[in-house]
């Protein structure tokens, strides 16, 4: 007999269903064989936890809830035999109960005065005399009826048990029982139908497929035991051999005398065999009691899943001393105290005899004691993985020896070029930017890339020295290799931002093939957990963990990493009990012979969590081929004879629209000002009108790119249902007064909330405390409104990472996805929209000749757009070939030198001329003031950036000329510079200037949070020197080049900053950064800098200075302008 859980729709047999209900606390069960819900005969209560089947000796069986049972029977009248979920028998006896309930005469159907024999035959008193075997039947009045009818064992005192009031209950069977069949459902309303479908779709879209059948109730394991130095060496040797490629070596090492006992679970010392489950494990490991919390798990189980293959971790490379999130007073990630020198790959002496009582402290305080996981493996990495040359952060190190991979194609990116500027941490509450401290000594950093106090040196726009060379992989042999590679890159990034969790205990699985294990974490007075949640959420009792939450699980030296997620959790005796499972792409098996102190947990940011979840949802074969980069992408060219909505589209734009309609994957190159927004608008209109397919999802890495498209659609197509979804941090910037305010989801939801819930919403916006009941009611009503609005939208605009939020889980399928600024989207973040359900067409729109995203981990900078073009799987990418933004004098050099003449002007000099401006392209020679170095310190990283006060003074003069002489509004002027320090210095000077800011209005900041790595508020990362901030002074925009990508202004002033005797220009050498800087202006571009330094700093700059000299637009004073 099969049963189905009404809450999660999972179907099991009786035994498995009872385990499921006990662990999840789901309440309602459906009997699929009899087509009915299990409920109380009296009140129809369906809560399985309150129900029990009661047997009155051999007389009758009834199904009652606890409340009805207490009402009907007193203590002395209550029978001793009952079957409930608590004693694990209610579903086992359900079939017998149904048999008794349905019992009637086989001849006439009478339900009363019955008699039964051991063959299961039933006759009433009237029909019994007609049978020739009447003597074999027993009457229901004898008290032995059920023993004979059901074949139960009859005990000696069975007749002494309490008798049921009124005898056996009738009227429950086929002739109309009172509460057996489920009540007739009321007709489902439209609102209820939407809610039901939304819930089912959300649950499906939130599921992580599981390969383990373990849950908290049935888990059988043993406590991870710390090893002594002698045994640790043996385990280390065993683990090393286990990690070698080839047949599984899991059972090797069991021949050790210390471990020679059969089925010794932990494999360390003389531990006895532990035949336990989670309820009777070692007492001090906090066993799981029965009263579990309702976890409502959405992790489906494939009980036939196979164990993981034994293979070497491709990332087992000798690592330098890594940053630790515990601050300056913490131990580093290799387990050495700060101040100790750690030579990569070098063995140091040490043992456990340190005098520390805590084994974890003994390990962390040992001077480089070898991790019990074993020696560093010299195995080569798996095929298809990215290769790293890791720069040393210590005085002495060695490079890892890695053999080239013959089956993959690689390109090498120089980390001294093509690098975006890093981002400073932004305090959202502050209206002004804090100026970094001046550098006290010029040569302070010349100490092997460190300051005197041992902090890492980082120059803005340059990579950390440990990742100075990176070889990216253009193709992968299989999806698991691909996912493993990017998971490790995410781990490297996250450990620069987040702090490790060290205090926990592990229960390893006894089954070698199981991929799940248990982690116990103290709930109370745990400072590590207090850092994971804001104070207001802690006050509401929100747990620090949640189901499906991913983590990085690694050894103390970070040489081995496992990627895990929480399958199920509960809170037991003041501890979080986490049943975690390996993601399916893990290469390493569980290290079940090692103690808890040898590992640490790294929490992930919300962005990284969504990426890892997206990795579990990539199932579309076409997209898998796209990611692996081995098969050519099919391209179909067909003239659809479309009727375009606009007659202003050029030929390249029309071709692009037709290509999208004919192909599942489209790569569209869109140089600056070529009408990408107009092309995307036409694609959306054609998809809706021709295919009636919606919702169409439009995503990008930045909000500005999304807003440009949304504003155009909103203005030109008011009849289309448009929705703009923002991250929580951005919602306050998009009020009703914003141009897009009326289509923003949070504003629409607020207007549709009840008055009481609007009050609660206002409290949460102000950061005020609310009660738990208010929080619950608000969450339910907000979800209901959100589901309805999202389900009815035709076009949804959001960022890549926000596309993985809970709002879009309600969408059953998303037929068309358009990604704008695809080169600014890291490949990791691209996986989020790529993994959405039901995608038929995916459109990448970008320009590989402009800046990509920035990350401290080089692999996370490359976009999927770039990699697809580099590996040659997309043979003929389309390109929009006509620019309409820039004055031809401004666009001439980028067209020739950067776009190789493939781009052309769609405007004339006359169309882009500004009254009174004779030189639309103007270079102002500014060589009198040298650059200054500025330092910003965060945690263990010292970042350097640059400013030039003399250039700032001259730029103020230029702005005044544009304002007063050329009549250019401040809103049409933008000042851009490569360096954040120059941006901040300029902003400070302009804010105090009485001509430019006569009313002394405070500076405003417009920021677009970096949705993936180095987000605003992250501390201690090199990339946090500069985020996507635009300072606005009385309408005038001041920004870095990187943050101004995607923007345009009538006039742009470009401050180059660099002026030194060494002719060094840093990341100004980046061809893409120069391209962005030169292509932001529509009517006039003014470049301020020292032509001599720029000319000698880079070949491309030399060409540009030569071009400017040929055009005779280099001036030493401003009178010519």
From Swiss-Prot:
Protein task: Probable RNA helicase, which may be involved in modulation of the translation termination process. Probably unwinds double-stranded RNA. In vitro, unwinds covalently closed, circular DNA in the presence of a DNA topoisomerase TOP1 and replication factor-A protein RFA1.
Modified residues (Phosphothreonine): 465
Bias kind Basic residues: ranges: 160-184, 251-263
PTM sites of type Phosphoserine: 227, 392
Miscellaneous comment as given in the Swiss-Prot or TrEMBL entry: Present with 736 molecules/cell in log phase SD medium.
Subcellular location: Cytoplasm
PANTHER family on file: ATP-DEPENDENT RNA HELICASE ECM32-RELATED (PTHR10887:SF317), DNA2/NAM7 HELICASE FAMILY (PTHR10887)
Binding positions for ATP per the UniProt entry: 670-677
Main location: cytoplasm
Sequence segments annotated as region (Disordered): 157-187, 233-452
Disruption phenotype: Sensitivity to drugs that affect translation fidelity. Overexpression results in a nonsense suppression phenotype.
Pfam families: AAA_11, AAA_12
Gene from which the chain derives: ECM32
InterPro entries documented for this protein: DNA2/NAM7-like, DNA2/NAM7-like_C, DNA2/NAM7_AAA_11, P-loop_NTPase, SF1_C_Upf1
Biased segments, Basic and acidic residues type: 307-316, 342-363, 426-452
The reaction(s) this protein catalyses: ATP + H2O = ADP + phosphate + H(+)
Top EC class for this record: hydrolase
Key words of the record: ATP-binding, Cytoplasm, DNA-binding, Helicase, Hydrolase, Nucleotide-binding, Phosphoprotein, RNA-binding
Protein name: Putative ATP-dependent RNA helicase ECM32
Gene Ontology BP term (one): regulation of translational termination
Annotated Low complexity bias: 323-336
Sample GO molecular function, one term: ATP hydrolysis activity
Quaternary structure and partners: Interacts with the peptidyl release factors SUP35 and weakly with SUP45.
């Amino acid at each position: 007999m099969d049963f189905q859980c009404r809450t999660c729709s999972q179907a099991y047999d009786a035994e498995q269903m009872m385990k499921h209900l006990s662990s999840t606390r789901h309440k309602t069960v459906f009997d699929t064989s009899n087509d009915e819900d299990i409920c109380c005969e009296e009140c129809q209560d369906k809560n399985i936890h309150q129900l029990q089947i009661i047997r009155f000796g051999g007389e009758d069986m009834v199904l009652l809830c606890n409340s009805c049972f207490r009402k009907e029977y007193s203590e002395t009248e209550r029978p001793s035999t009952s079957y409930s979920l608590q004693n694990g028998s209610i579903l086992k006896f359900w079939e017998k109960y149904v048999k008794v309930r349905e019992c009637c005469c086989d001849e006439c159907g009478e339900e009363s005065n019955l008699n039964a024999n051991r063959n299961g035959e039933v006759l009433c008193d009237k029909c019994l005399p007609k049978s020739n075997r009447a003597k074999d039947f027993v009457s229901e009045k004898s008290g032995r009826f059920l023993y004979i009818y059901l074949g139960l064992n009859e005990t000696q005192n069975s007749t002494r048990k309490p008798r049921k009031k009124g005898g056996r209950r009738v009227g429950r069977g086929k002739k109309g029982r009172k509460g057996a069949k489920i009540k007739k459902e009321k007709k489902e309303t439209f609102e209820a139908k939407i809610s039901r479908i939304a819930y089912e779709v959300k649950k499906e879209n939130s599921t992580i497929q599981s390969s383990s059948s373990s849950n908290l109730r049935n888990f059988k394991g043993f406590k991870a035991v710390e090893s002594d130095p002698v045994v640790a060496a043996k385990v280390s040797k065993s683990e090393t051999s286990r990690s070698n490629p080839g047949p599984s070596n899991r059972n090797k090492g069991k021949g050790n005398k210390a471990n020679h006992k059969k089925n010794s679970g932990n494999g360390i010392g003389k531990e006895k065999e532990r035949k336990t489950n989670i309820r009777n494990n070692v007492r001090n490991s906090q066993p799981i009691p029965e009263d579990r919390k309702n976890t409502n798990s959405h992790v489906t189980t494939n009980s036939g899943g196979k164990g993981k293959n034994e293979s070497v971790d491709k990332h087992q490379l000798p690592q330098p001393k890594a940053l630790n999130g515990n601050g300056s007073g913490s131990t580093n990630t290799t387990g050495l105290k700060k101040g100790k020198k750690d030579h990569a790959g070098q063995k140091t002496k040490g043992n456990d005899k340190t005098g520390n009582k805590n084994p974890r402290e003994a390990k962390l305080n040992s001077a480089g004691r070898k991790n019990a996981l074993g020696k560093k493996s010299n195995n080569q990495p798996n095929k298809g993985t990215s290769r790293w040359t890791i720069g040393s952060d210590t005085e002495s190190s060695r490079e890892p020896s890695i053999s080239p991979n013959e089956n993959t194609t690689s390109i090498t990116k120089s980390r001294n070029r093509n690098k975006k500027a890093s981002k400073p941490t932004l305090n959202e509450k502050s209206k002004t930017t804090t100026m970094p401290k001046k550098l006290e000594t010029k040569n302070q950093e010349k100490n092997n890339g460190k300051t005197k106090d041992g902090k890492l040196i980082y120059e803005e726009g340059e990579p950390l020295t440990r990742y100075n060379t990176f070889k990216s992989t253009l193709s992968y042999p299989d999806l698991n290799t691909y996912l493993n590679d990017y998971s490790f890159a995410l781990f490297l990034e996250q450990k620069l931002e987040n702090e490790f969790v060290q205090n926990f205990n592990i229960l390893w699985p006894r089954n070698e093939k199981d991929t799940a294990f248990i982690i116990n974490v103290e709930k109370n007075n745990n400072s590590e957990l207090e850092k994971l949640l804001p104070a207001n959420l802690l006050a509401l009792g929100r747990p620090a963990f949640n189901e499906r939450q991913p983590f990085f699980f690694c050894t103390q030296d970070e040489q081995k990493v496992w990627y895990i997620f929480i399958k199920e959790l509960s809170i037991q005796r003041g501890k979080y009990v986490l049943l975690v499972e390996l993601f399916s792409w893990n290469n390493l098996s569980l290290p079940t012979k090692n103690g808890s102190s040898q590992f640490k947990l790294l929490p992930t940011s919300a962005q990284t969590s969504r990426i890892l979840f997206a990795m579990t949802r990539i199932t579309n074969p076409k997209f898998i081929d796209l990611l692996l980069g081995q098969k050519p992408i099919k391209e179909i060219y067909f003239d659809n004879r479309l009727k375009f909505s606009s007659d202003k589209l050029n030929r390249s734009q029309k071709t692009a629209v037709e290509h999208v309609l004919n192909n599942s994957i489209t790569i569209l190159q869109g140089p600056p000002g070529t009408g990408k927004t107009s092309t995307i608008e036409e694609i959306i209109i054609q998809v809706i009108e021709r295919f009636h397919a919606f919702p169409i999802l439009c995503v990008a890495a930045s909000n500005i790119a999304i807003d440009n498209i949304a504003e155009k659609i909103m203005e030109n197509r008011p009849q289309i249902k448009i929705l703009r979804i923002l991250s929580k941090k951005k919602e306050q910037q998009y009020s009703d007064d914003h141009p897009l305010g009326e289509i923003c989801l949070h504003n629409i939801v607020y207007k549709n909330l009840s008055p009481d819930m609007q009050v609660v919403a206002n409290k949460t916006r102000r950061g005020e405390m609310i009660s738990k009941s208010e929080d619950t009611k608000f969450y339910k009503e907000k979800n209901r409104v959100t589901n309805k609005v999202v389900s009815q939208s035709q076009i949804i605009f959001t960022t890549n990472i926000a596309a993985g939020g809970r709002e879009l889980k309600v969408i059953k399928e998303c037929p068309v996805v358009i990604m704008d600024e695809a080169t600014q989207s890291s490949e990791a973040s691209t996986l989020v929209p790529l993994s959405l359900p039901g995608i038929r067409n995916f459109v990448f729109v970008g320009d590989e000749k402009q800046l990509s995203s920035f990350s401290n981990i080089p692999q996370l900078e490359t976009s999927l757009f770039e990699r697809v073009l580099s590996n040659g799987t997309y043979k003929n990418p389309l390109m929009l070939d006509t620019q309409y933004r820039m004055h031809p004098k401004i666009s001439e050099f980028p067209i020739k030198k950067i776009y190789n003449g493939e781009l052309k002007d769609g405007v004339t000099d006359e169309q882009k001329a500004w009254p009174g401006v004779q030189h639309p392209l103007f270079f102002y020679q500014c060589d009198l003031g040298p650059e200054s170095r500025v330092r910003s310190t965060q945690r263990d990283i010292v970042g350097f950036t640059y400013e030039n006060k003399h250039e700032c003074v001259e730029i103020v003069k230029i702005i005044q000329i544009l304002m007063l002489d050329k009549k250019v509004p401040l809103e049409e002027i933008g000042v851009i510079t490569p360096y954040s320090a120059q941006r901040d210095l300029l902003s400070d000077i302009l804010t105090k200037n009485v001509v430019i800011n006569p009313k002394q209005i405070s500076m405003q900041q417009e920021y677009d949070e970096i949705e993936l790595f180095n987000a605003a508020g992250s501390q201690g990362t090199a990339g946090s020197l500069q985020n996507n901030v635009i300072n606005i002074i009385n309408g005038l925009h001041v920004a870095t080049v990187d943050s101004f990508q995607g923007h345009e202004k009538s006039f742009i002033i470009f401050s180059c900053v660099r002026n030194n005797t060494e002719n060094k220009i840093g990341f100004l050498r980046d061809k893409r950064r120069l391209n962005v800087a030169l292509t932001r202006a529509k009517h006039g571009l003014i470049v301020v800098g020292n032509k001599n330094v720029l000319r000698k700093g880079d070949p491309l700059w030399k060409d540009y200075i030569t071009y400017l000299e040929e055009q005779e637009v280099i001036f030493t004073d401003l009178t010519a302008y």
